[in-house]
Amino acid sequence: MAKRLEIYKCLKCGNVVEVIAGGAGELVCCGEPMKLMDEKNKEGAGEKHVPVVETKDNGVLIKVGSVPHPMDADHWIQFIEVIRKDGKVGRKDLNPGDKPEAFFIMKPEDILSVREFCNKHGLWSK
């Protein structure tokens, strides 16, 4: 059963999906069940992956890692996402060459969680 806001990845083709509305069915791609991505927050290369939240005058700036994450053609952050306490979600999709950061107009106290998805190392959260 897929739940709202879970992230799944196809291990064959690399498709990544986020569940908008949960349901009882199994997510399948390329003829195989998709892998549920666990949220990491400490292990391995955390200094380049765990989101860092900075408060700004009219919102929050989310940077990926205390050390900037590479944004190369073969290794980059695909998106940065903020999940608010009221259930709303903000997301910025990124491409190779972009800065690994996103600005959201919101109050820091409204943040429930922040996460990002690295094409090589998966889903990371704070």
Name these PLM-found stretches.
Residues 119-126:
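Short acidic/polar inter-strand loop motif in beta-rich domains
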Residues 63-64, 100-107:
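Exposed aromatic-hydrophobic patches
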Residues 10-13, 29, 118:
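Short cysteine-rich clusters marking metal-coordination/redox-active sites
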Residues 7, 16, 26, 115:
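Residues immediately within or flanking Cys/His clusters that coordinate Zn2+
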Residues 17, 33-34, 122:
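Cys/His-rich microdomains that often coordinate metals
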Residues 1-12:
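Intrinsically disordered, low-complexity linker/tail regions enriched in polar/charged residues
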Residues 64-72:
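Short amphipathic, basic-aromatic surface patches that mediate peripheral association
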Residues 23-33:
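Cysteine-rich micro-motifs
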